[in-house]
């Protein structure tokens, strides 16, 4: 219901983009009965623009539509180029960048590049190019590791460490996947998707006792959330 509701304001548009990404990433698919909402991001910042293009890329990936995915990559690259012109050598947005809340920053430019690498990895997957997929994912995690953690709504909707971890699991490389999920959890403690990925990696490594401990964390955290919501 929340995804289908939004007023014409920058805050609600930003929230809608975040929620749509969260729905698709956490579930692993987009519900057929739910219509994806198009959002006019012209007055929003690079974070929201990155997230919107990433969401569209996920939908294109699900449909195995490489052409549509490439268009999203091209679109975000254009936004990155425009934003780069508004940040000076010190990494500070110039006056012409608009409202401070949505003005681009040097950090934001780097995080956008992370998202582009993630999208390129998905495109490589569709084309069956495993070496290029891994190259893009490795580059994404390297760059994300150089960035600060977002205390509020995440700039990077699908942490590249988790995306890489999920891909490594699919390649039957659980030990390497575990490293990526642990990296994601190092600054996103109790993130459900990362914990589930960690469980899958541990079980693939026959480390069942450790997997049970992680599963207990999910149960405890979920219970705490239910109590808080009452």
Regions found by a protein language model. Give the residues of each.
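Start-of-helix signal in alpha-solenoid helical-repeat scaffolds, especially tetratricopeptide repeats
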Residues: 14, 48-50, 107-114, 158, ...
């Amino acid at each position: 219901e929340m995804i289908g509701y939004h007023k014409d304001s920058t805050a609600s548009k930003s929230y809608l983009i975040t929620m749509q990404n969260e729905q698709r990433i956490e579930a692993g698919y987009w519900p057929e009965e739910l219509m994806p909402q198009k959002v006019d991001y012209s007055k929003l910042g690079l974070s929201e623009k990155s997230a919107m293009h990433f969401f569209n890329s996920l939908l294109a990936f699900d449909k195995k539509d490489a052409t549509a995915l490439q268009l999203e990559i091209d679109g975000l690259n254009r936004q990155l180029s425009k934003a780069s012109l508004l940040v000076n050598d010190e990494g500070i947005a110039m006056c012409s960048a608009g409202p401070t809340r949505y003005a681009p920053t040097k950090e934001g430019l780097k995080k956008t590049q992370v998202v582009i690498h993630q999208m390129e990895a998905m495109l490589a997957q569709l084309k069956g190019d495993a070496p290029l997929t891994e190259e893009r994912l490795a580059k994404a995690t390297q760059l994300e590791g150089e960035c600060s953690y977002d205390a509020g709504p995440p700039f990077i909707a699908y942490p590249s460490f988790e995306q890489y971890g999920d891909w490594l699991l699919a390649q039957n490389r659980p030990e390497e996947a575990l490293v990526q999920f642990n990296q994601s959890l190092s600054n996103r403690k109790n993130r459900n998707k990362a914990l589930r990925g960690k469980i899958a990696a541990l079980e693939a490594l026959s480390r069942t006792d450790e997997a049970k401990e992680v599963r207990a964390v999910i149960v405890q955290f979920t219970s705490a959330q239910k109590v808080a919501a009452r």
